[in-house]
Amino acid sequence: MKQQSAKINDLDLHNWKEYTDILTDSLWLIGARDKSGAHNNKYHGNFIPQIPNQLMQRFTQKGDIVLDPFLGHGTTLIEAKRMGRHGIGVELLPEVARLAKKNIDSESADSPGICSEVIVADNSTDKAKSGVVDALKKIGGENVHLIVLHPPYHDIIKFSDRKEDLCNASTVEEFTSRFGDVIEAFSDLLARKRYLAVVIGDKYTNSEWVPLGFYLMQETLKRGPRLQLKSILVKNMVNNRAKLNQENLWRYRALVGGFYIFKHEYIFVFKKN
């Protein structure tokens, strides 16, 4: 007899060959971003909906609760709502949170009774954590079942002048440590044997490749002691807005400078023991 309590997704593995849309390789080659429904790419720095979609198909069931501590314009919660998952998001900037709530509210829910809660707070503070706990109570749960984190790639994009904003961290070390504060704040709310994913890219500064992805991977393992690294996924980057219509210029710069052009980002997948 199948043990339903151990199941973390809605996949019928007796018919596993039917799931041709689900990625199982560590190299993710994804085309144009999904712009259906409430999804859009007006917010510079938001990630493509296909990432949370893939993660939710693999690691959640309908009715589960998904947490995004770096909500932005709401991509994760939009996708959660359309897939029948409850969503909780934390956003530092009130004006961005308002737009996120508007986007999420405009999306149709896959199932009745789906809740989407947006909390305006610094995600490393007690206020943010207590807000998430209150949202869990409102939904009727004690833990979240998936955490998706897509932080700023340090100072590549300046989202605000707020000192609490990770894009304003003065050093890579400060950026990494403050990201660890977020892991520490929320990893204990993750249900046992459930998953946490970090979506992050690297940067190039002062003629040096800065491996932000691996720094955050190590910090996640350090600050979330019950987390186990399960996968390192490499996803292609296409139509990068910062390099749009400048392909030849960047190719020339790469040839002159002896470096390679960023065409990938990482998705680090962890499981809570």
Regions found by a protein language model. Give the residues of each.
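Class I S-adenosyl-L-methionine-dependent methyltransferase catalytic core
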Residues: 1-273
